[in-house]
Amino acid sequence: MNFDVAIIGGGLAGLTCAIALQQRGKRCVIINNGQAAIDFASGSLDLLSRMPSTTYGENRAVENLKENITALRNELPAHPYSLLGAEKVLAKAQDFERLANELHLDLIGSTEKNHWRVTGLGSLRGAWLSPNSVPTVQGNEPFPHKRIAVLGIEGYHDFQPQLLAANLVLNPQFEHCEVTSGFLNIPQLDELRKNAREFRSVNISQLLEHKLAFKDLVKEIIESAQGAEAVFLPACFGLENQEFMTALRDATKLALFELPTLPPSLLGMRQRIQLRHKFESLGGLMINGDSALNATFEGNQVRCINTRLLEDEEITADNFVLASGSFFSKGLISEFDKIYEPVFESDIIGVEGFNNKDRFTWTAHRFAHPQPYQSAGVAINAQCQVKKCGQFLTNLYAVGNVIGGFNALELGCGSGVAVVTALAVADEILAK
């Protein structure tokens, strides 16, 4: 099978890159191994939330994105943002904002500065873009609603309203609020309660989206809110989009917000579903449940790849994009004596002091400190071309968290790296 572009990985980075290419006339295939990290994400995207700490002290929170992305080059020269340059990073981030609006992802935020989003535990976390159904505040501004009811679902343990309510008022932006907590009694979920493994956000949303007892649910929310102006709910209402939440908001006439629960995350799944629908509607091909095994090279180019399900058929393309993610998605593999990228056997880099063949450099002494192994990934140049055996391959690009040289957990930049590198690589391929 021959394509213009073959993309390995169907997560945020792979889908974003594929959509940008399909929109400009390229014929793309995505080899998708299974659920991506986006299915377990909060739904909020971070461009850069914290600056690195050289002494394992407190990481400084980022508010002004342009200023800090520019400063990042001095501290982490191998970070993808440092390689691309601040101007291109911000330009590609703005391109993604336009794409998100086009796809009706219902995201709020901008590259001007970060905002704070409320987490499922009641703390505040910096973010670049968040679903407009998630409660957010800008800087130290007070939350606009004074009376808040945090409502869980009886028997649902992946969202704890009492804990959230107690932690929420500790934040200066919510110290003026009166916060109560309670539980919704939804009889339609009784069947799910019999098996705790099935009582998850996805199962709940699938059961409720048929709106068989919509009026009863509206009545239960109004009564449980007890006169509150705003209601925080677990993200269990509406699997593919926010239409169900919008209908509830209109019917209750309350300021309803939803918060991410323990994974799987409905907020992240909605985004992946909408991105995939867009890609396929543009004529792209997604091969699900398959994984790339190895590649054949000709000089400094990739000629073809082989996959697990298509053993006897090579996938050839003019360009290849590695969007396979990090350890979670098996884009990187760790053995006792080495960390490696399994498909192309690309060169691996990390932060200063990390050696992918020296296990003693993989971890920090303190568990809570940033761990060097989390910065492992493939080496790239300013065009996001992948390095192998010291040479850059001219038709192989890497996007997202398979790239090394930065710790996405420490810096809060995983989503930003995914979409920025994805759109930058799309531009590189289209310019050929």
Curated annotation (Swiss-Prot):
The keyword Flavoprotein applies. Disulfide bonds: none annotated. Its cofactor is FMN. PANTHER family: ANAEROBIC GLYCEROL-3-PHOSPHATE DEHYDROGENASE SUBUNIT B, FUMARATE REDUCTASE. Belongs to the anaerobic G-3-P dehydrogenase subunit B family. Conversion of glycerol 3-phosphate to dihydroxyacetone. Uses fumarate or nitrate as electron acceptor. This is Anaerobic glycerol-3-phosphate dehydrogenase subunit B. It comes from Haemophilus influenzae (strain ATCC 51907 / DSM 11121 / KW20 / Rd).
